[in-house]
Design a protein with these regions (language model features):
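Short alpha-helix C-terminal cap/hinge motif
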Residues: 43-59
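Extracytoplasmic ligand-binding site segments that recognize negatively charged/polar headgroups
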Residues: 26, 30-42, 63-67, 80-217
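Mature extracytoplasmic/periplasmic domains
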Residues: 258-314
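Periplasmic-binding protein-like
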Residues: 132, 191-195, 201-202, 234-259, ...
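Extracellular/periplasmic bilobal clamshell ligand-binding domains
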Residues: 300-336
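A bilobed periplasmic-binding-protein/Venus flytrap-type ligand-binding module shared by bacterial periplasmic
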Residues: 137-142, 180, 251-263, 273, ...
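A ligand-binding cleft/hinge motif common to bilobed small-molecule-binding domains
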Residues: 90-94, 213, 217-238, 287
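Short beta-strand->loop
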Residues: 102-110, 124-127, 151-154, 231-249, ...
Length: 336
């Protein structure tokens, strides 16, 4: 009889616990796979928000930021996502024109710590959460004399490089913008000069970076902050980013609330918390980027990273106007 009572009690307890969990609203966030991964910021961000939101956060990891935007466009107004996280300023104008995003209605004035080159942040749909520079990374044990400019990189016929596709990966898109910012109308010639040095062009960042780590390339397109991971997490100081005399292209990552969300107030609360100290301080040692808000802390290892004297950043509108032609130039240049 006691066994029977215990069984009924435990079963009822499990059912009520499950019911309570189901009663909590679910906040669905589309992002890129490394953000949502167990070693990315996703799990810590989820735990931090769930402390106070009385909700369940679900990250849906897609192959890239470009993939996030593509998924949202495909699903349209029927998307299950409440938030898109991980787009950057090369995609925000295109994203805004889909008419799938709500204004964030958050005050960012005085709360951000973005470089001066970004200017005053007045985007009504997207709030920044981190930023960094694109750079070619190398292993000092394998490459003693890394190029210090695009011109030196292009002149070295022995270099083996791996990059990403701008149509599918944000770093690849960043390189395309970087080259156009530096060389303008000469960009097609630069792609033709770069082509013989390429081991391959990958779909995503990790595909390229893992090839580099396995010794299949001398340099990989990544971020100026990537060496911080090796230094802080692995205690390895032989990975570095090459500082280029022409300057580096900047990336600012953002998040926005979708019109399809049935929980816009909760989604906006998440964006607000994303700019506060607790979440901002998670990002440098999980997403390996600089925090976008003034409240974020940067660990000691970041002081050893390159600090470009010059940076480049097109407005979202310029990217939207020229992206298709620049992609065409990229394809044709690498095909020569």
């Amino acid at each position: 009889m006691l066994k029977y009572i215990l069984t009924i009690t435990l079963t009822f307890g499990m059912l009520t616990t499950g019911a309570k969990a189901e009663d909590k609203p679910e906040l669905v966030i589309y992002t890129y796979d490394s953000f949502a991964s167990e070693w990315g910021p996703g799990p810590q961000i989820k735990a931090e928000f769930e402390k106070t939101c009385n909700c369940v956060v679900t990250f849906v990891g897609l192959d890239s930021s470009v993939g996030v935007l593509g998924r949202i466009q495909l699903e349209g107004g029927s998307s299950k996502a409440d938030i898109a996280l991980g787009l950057d300023t090369s995609l925000t104008s295109i994203a805004a024109k889909t008419d799938l995003f709500l204004p964030h209605n958050l005050e960012t004035r005085g709360k951000l710590a973005l470089p001066d080159d970004v200017g005053f942040w007045d985007d009504p749909y997207f709030v920044p959460f981190d930023w960094g520079y694109f750079a070619f990374n190398y292993d000092k044990n394998r490459l003693a004399n890394a190029p210090s400019s695009f011109d030196e990189l292009l002149a070295d016929n022995d270099l083996k490089i791996v990059i990403q596709d701008p149509r599918t990966a944000t770093p690849g898109l960043g390189l395309m913008l970087w080259v156009n910012a530096v060389y303008g109308e000469q960009a097609p010639e630069i792609w033709a000069k770069l082509a013989p040095k390429l081991v391959t062009v990958t779909k995503g960042w990790w595909d390229a970076y893992s090839m580099f780590l396995e010794g299949e390339a001398d340099m990989v397109l990544s971020y100026s902050t990537s060496p911080a991971y090796h230094l802080i997490a692995e205690e390895k100081d032989h990975y570095a980013a090459a500082g280029f005399a022409e300057g580096h292209y900047m990336q600012v990552e953002v998040a926005g609330v979708l019109k399809s969300s049935k929980k816009p107030a909760l989604a906006r609360l998440f964006l607000q918390k994303l700019m506060e100290k607790e979440m901002q301080s998670i990002l440098p040692t999980t997403n390996w980027m600089y925090p976008a808000a003034a409240s974020g802390d940067v660990p000691e290892g970041f002081g050893d990273l390159i600090n470009p004297a010059k940076s480049h950043l097109f407005s979202p509108e310029v990217v939207a106007q020229n992206r298709d032609q620049w992609v065409k130039d990229w394809v044709e240049g690498l095909s020569q």
